[in-house]
């Protein structure tokens, strides 16, 4: 795989980690009584999964995996 794709994959992995941290923060807020935080956490988690999927696709070398 080209260095450019490796770089993009690494950036996506970093973004996924940031999203995971944000999701944890929203869960903590939900426990503290923030009514909208649980819905935000679910949305952030869906986005994190999509970013992880994109990163995995770039790392696999095959779009059919």
Feature annotation, model-predicted:
Residues 1-22:
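N-terminal acidic leader/helix
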Residues 3, 17, 39-40, 64:
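Intrinsic disorder/low-complexity signal
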Residues 8, 63-65:
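Acidic, Ser/Thr- and Gly-enriched intrinsically disordered low-complexity segments
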Residues 13, 23, 28, 58-59:
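Compositionally biased amphipathic helical and low-complexity segments enriched in hydrophobic
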Residues 18-37:
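Short E/K-rich amphipathic alpha-helical oligomerization segments
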Residues 31-63:
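Short, charge-rich amphipathic interface segments used for partner binding and complex assembly
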